[in-house]
C-alpha cells in the first residue's frame, strides 16, 4: 500500500507559543512549580501508583519475552505488513464491522472528542482562575491583619507615652529632661518617642 495514501495526523505544538495573559491554568502551573507544591490527595496517589505498576509490569513482560526468544534462537515477532495493509484497506472502504463506540465514522468520534476536550479546558481555566483569585484574597487578608496588628501596637505605645507624660506632669513639676521625659535607663538603650513612633512600628 502506498504510504502517501495513509492519512497523516497533524499535532499542534503549543509549547513554543506565547502564553496568553488570561491563561490562568498556565499561571497556576507556574505558581505551583515555583512554590514546589505537590498534591497529597489519596485518589491521585493511588492512581499514580497503579499507572506506575502497570508500566513496570508491561516492561517486565516485554523484556522477559525478548529474552526467551533470544535463548530459543527465534527472531522477534513482528506484525505482518500484509495484515496492516489489509486492515487499512478495509478501513478505507468502510467495511469495518465493529462500531466506533456508537459513532458512525472516525470523523464524528474526533469531533466529539475535540468538543469534550475544549469543554474540559474551559472548566480547567475557570477552576484555575478561582484558585488564583482565592490566593489573592488570602494574601490580602494577611496584609490587612498585619496592618491591623501593627496599628494596635502603635496605638498602645502612643497611649502608654501619653499616660507617662500625664503622670510625670502630675507627680513632678520639675523641668523636662532632654530625653523627652523618659528615664535615663530607657535613654541608654535608645527608647525615645522618635524611635517608638517612626522606627519600631509601621502603619504599612
Swiss-Prot record:
InterPro entries: FAM167, FAM167_domain. Pfam families: FAM167. Residues 58-80 are annotated as: Disordered. Residues 113-146 form a coiled coil. Keywords: Coiled coil. The keyword Coiled coil applies. Belongs to the FAM167 (SEC) family. This is Protein FAM167A.
Amino acid at each position: 500500500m502506498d504510504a502517501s495514501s495513509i492519512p497523516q495526523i497533524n499535532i499542534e505544538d503549543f509549547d513554543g507559543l506565547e502564553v496568553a495573559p488570561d491563561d490562568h491554568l498556565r499561571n497556576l502551573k507556574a505558581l505551583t512549580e515555583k512554590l514546589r507544591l505537590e498534591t497529597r490527595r489519596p485518589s491521585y496517589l493511588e492512581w499514580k501508583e497503579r499507572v506506575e505498576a502497570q508500566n513496570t509490569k508491561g516492561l517486565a513482560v516485554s523484556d522477559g519475552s525478548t529474552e526467551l526468544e533470544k535463548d530459543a534462537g527465534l527472531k522477534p515477532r513482528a506484525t505482518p505488513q500484509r495484515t496492516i495493509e489489509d486492515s487499512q484497506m478495509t478501513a478505507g472502504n468502510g467495511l469495518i464491522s465493529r462500531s466506533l463506540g456508537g459513532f458512525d465514522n472516525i470523523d464524528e468520534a474526533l469531533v466529539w472528542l475535540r468538543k469534550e476536550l475544549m469543554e474540559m479546558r474551559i472548566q480547567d481555566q475557570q477552576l484555575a482562575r478561582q484558585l488564583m483569585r482565592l490566593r489573592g484574597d488570602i494574601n490580602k487578608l494577611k496584609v490587612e491583619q498585619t496592618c491591623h496588628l501593627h496599628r494596635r501596637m502603635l496605638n498602645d505605645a502612643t497611649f502608654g507615652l501619653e499616660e507617662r507624660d500625664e503622670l510625670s506632669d502630675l507627680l513632678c513639676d520639675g523641668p523636662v529632661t532632654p530625653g523627652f521625659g523618659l528615664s535615663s535607663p530607657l535613654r541608654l538603650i535608645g527608647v525615645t518617642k522618635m524611635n517608638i513612633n517612626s522606627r519600631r512600628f509601621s502603619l504599612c
